[in-house]
Amino acid sequence: MVQVNENYLKLKAGYLFPEIAKRVKLYSQSNKNAEIIKLGIGDVTEPLPRACIEAMGKALDDMGTTDGFRGYGPEQGYAWLREKISEHDFISRGCQISPEEIFVSDGSKCDSSNILDILGKDNSIAVTDPVYPVYVDSNVMTGRTGDALENGTYQGLTYLAINEANNFLPELPEKKVDILYLCFPNNPTGATINKEELKKWVDYALQNKSLILFDAAYEAFIQDNDIPHSIYEIEGAKDCAIEFRSFSKNAGFTGVRCAFTVIPKNLKGLSSTNEEIELWPLWNRRQSTKFNGVSYVVQKGAEAVYSLEGKKQVRGLIDFYMENAKIMKNKLQNSGYKVYGGDNAPYIWIKVPDQMTSWDFFDFLLQKVSVVGTPGSGFGLAGEGYFRLSAFNSRSNVIDAMERIINI
């Protein structure tokens, strides 16, 4: 009989969001008339930008002609999209990222997991706590951790707590760590980091020859001018960081699927014989072998994000969701809740009432007012006592949900 990858057996009972779905399903089955409002998973609700729809429609028409048909595309992504990304997302902010250093993909979730394919298994790893679960689970699946402990953490990982005491900004590791996962604006806490603080991480990585895996999936939601949108705004970051970006939240591509990863050409790692190896060729080889590229139609839709009309429409989507976040934060704060995030990110991070755990508060909101959020403990040990609400929903649902919660 075939042997299984036993690393999967080390995973905790269930991925956070399937567990939420299971509880919601049980509740809805016994409360068939309940009007459930879901503010849990960060999935968008508003239609795609018209510029993207028109671009994809034209691309489909192109595919119906002999001259316009496209088969397999380049694994790295079409040059015309990578050029737009380079110009608008990086060069415009003073980051010297070339189109050649950009790899178009079908999701930053995939890339932040798949990047482990080109990194050795003996690297030491640090994650924030709480943390986006994918960073931890992907390391467990590939055998980079020990067993799960009773408190839900894994042997072999370094956890960097983020909480009220440190303004949800992690402290630098006390010892040398090879791989550092950072996500800003942060999921789940909604916290942001300024250039001075981010420079400390870049300096640490350069000093220790560490690699930063920087998730900037929510950079488009930044409102404050002094907050960096890219780690490459920090001098030296091209020598120590890989950045993940996505069209999912800013342009509503969660169901369309398009993202990109930046791997600078001069970024290097070490072989077992201490030979310096460039990471770009390794990732290019990995993608060429395991990935067929994002469809021509989808990439044309992504290109339209950078058109004049596309930019206006994307800005409209971002403003809509951030107004939702503002409404949520104001309503909850005015009713006595301690609330964080929501100013430069589409997530609200709530301190749950005393005597309740995160899952207690989840069940409380579900049973009392049919509102679904995400228990903070699902993001890590330090997330216990907190609760995440997403601003990705209709305006009427957001207002209704807040009225239900504050009137319990």
From Swiss-Prot:
GO terms for molecular function: L,L-diaminopimelate aminotransferase activity; pyridoxal phosphate binding. It comes from the Bacteria. Its EC number is 2.6.1.83. Pfam families: Aminotran_1_2. Pyridoxal 5'-phosphate binds at residues 72, 108-109, 132, 187, 218, 246-248, 257, 292. Its cofactor is pyridoxal 5'-phosphate. Substrate binds at residues 15, 42, 109, 132, 187, 292, 388. CDD domains: AAT_like (cd00609). Transmembrane segments: none annotated. Pathway: Amino-acid biosynthesis; L-lysine biosynthesis via DAP pathway; LL-2,6-diaminopimelate from (S)-tetrahydrodipicolinate (aminotransferase route): step 1/1. The modification N6-(pyridoxal phosphate)lysine is found at residue 249. It catalyses: (2S,6S)-2,6-diaminopimelate + 2-oxoglutarate = (S)-2,3,4,5-tetrahydrodipicolinate + L-glutamate + H2O + H(+). GO terms for biological process: lysine biosynthetic process via diaminopimelate, diaminopimelate-aminotransferase pathway. Keywords: Aminotransferase, Pyridoxal phosphate, Transferase. The keyword Cell cycle does not apply. Involved in the synthesis of meso-diaminopimelate (m-DAP or DL-DAP), required for both lysine and peptidoglycan biosynthesis. Catalyzes the direct conversion of tetrahydrodipicolinate to LL-diaminopimelate. NCBIfam families: DAPAT_plant. Homodimer. Belongs to the class-I pyridoxal-phosphate-dependent aminotransferase family. LL-diaminopimelate aminotransferase subfamily. This is LL-diaminopimelate aminotransferase.
